[in-house]
Structures are given as C-alpha cells and as structure tokens.
Amino acid sequence: RLTIFMILFAVTGYFYAQTARVQVIHNSADAAAEFVDVYLNEDLLIPDFGFRTASPFIDAPAGVEIVLSVAPAGSTSVDDAIYFAEVTLTSGETYVVVADGIVSASGYNPAPSFGLQIYPMGREVANDPANTDLLIHHGATDAPTVDIVETALGAGTIVNDISYTEFAGYLELPPFDYTIEVRTADGSTTVASYQAPLATLSLEGVALVVVASGFLDPSQNSDGAAFGLYAALPVGGNLIMLPTSASTARVQAIHNSADA
C-alpha cells in the first residue's frame, strides 16, 4: 500500500518544478475511519490507509494549492470524501500531517471533528546524528491537557501543557533509555507511564513522531482503542507502541533500631 502511495505521489509531482516533503500519520481512533482512502486533488494516492500507520516521507507538489481529501476505504472517487483540506505547501519544506478526530455522528464522547493537523519544519533525520529527535503530538480526543515528565534520569518536565491537536517542538535527546509519565497539567494525576528505549532500539540519528493515540475511556467511545503513545518512523509503516512502565517512587531507607 505504501509503495503505491509513493509511486502515485512521484507521478503527480513530476508535473511540478517545486516540491515539499510530507509524511502522513493516521491517528483517528474512530472505528468508522479504521481504514480510509487518501486523495490528492482527484487522484487516489493511498487506498486502505490503516489506523496507527504512517506513510514514508515523500515528495509532494509545492507552490500551488492542492486538495487533500479523505474518503471511506473502498471509495469510487474523490466525490466520496468525508473531509478535505486546501493547502499550499512551501517548496523545500518538510511537513508532518496527522489525521485525528471523529467522523461518527454518535458513540463518542467527546467527539471533536475529524481533521488533518499539519506541522511544518518536520525532520527526516536528527539534527545531531548523536541524538534522537522526538516530535510530540497530542491526538487523543478524550485526554486533557497534559505534561510529559521524564522520571528515570531526572530530566523532569520535557513537554509542558500540550492539548489535543497540538504539537510540541522537537526534543533533541541523547539516545538513552527513558521513562516518561503523562500527567495532568496540574501534576496531580499520572495518566500513564511509558518506556522510551532509545538506546536499546539504537535510534541515534533518527527523528521520530510520537503521538498520543486512542481513548482514556474506551467505554465512552464505542469500546475503541485504548490510550497509548505510538512512534512513527521516517520510513513509515505500522506505528511502534511504547511499552508501559509501572510507576515507581523514590525511597530512602534509614536504619534507626537501637536493638543490638
């Protein structure tokens, strides 16, 4: 599927002297959008684009207005689209595009509308080949504004007050194995804790997009996919689930018994 996407983008881009680089990530947890068709203008670019998958970075026409449309899988033409966005990409720029939100009329609470979130200044590799660069995106429809706090190495708050649909700028991190907690913005509640094993996975020099995905309360959202953090590689494919980590506390033991 991704190969077809790359070929069609290459064919379409052939007619344009200016191009931009684009990666698309499917992060809409609505069951009605589990698989979608993506169009550029009237051309079908990627059929059956699955939830929690990403395209590779590809060349797209720049300097002219294009229409990106999303239709249910199995669509017959762009006329079946349930969403479209008119965009003009900047030549030479790199973009990350994330699909979030709900298309169903009922069964989801809350139910923000489906949309494409577009981040310019994307990266295909880390700025420093000795680091791993992480772009964080909040795409969980029922999750509040949160902080992301690193606890294993004492880095503390690495993302502050990120809300649904927002991106935090790239974090340029040494490739260590981290433990990160997703906390409510006031710090009172830890939503979940995850491992980010950058060293174990040998991710030095790599730029990743990490998305908050799924539902904190599936029972209010048609028993949909549970909340988690997922990473998209520059080469695309299935998103990588960050493993959960049991929350820990710092403890000091003091021996104060006078019994001989």
What would you call each of these model-derived segments?
Residues 18-260:
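Intrinsically disordered, low-complexity polar regions and short flexible loop motifs
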Residues 2-11:
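Sec-dependent N-terminal signal peptides
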Residues 13-17:
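Sec/Tat signal peptide C-region and signal peptidase I cleavage site
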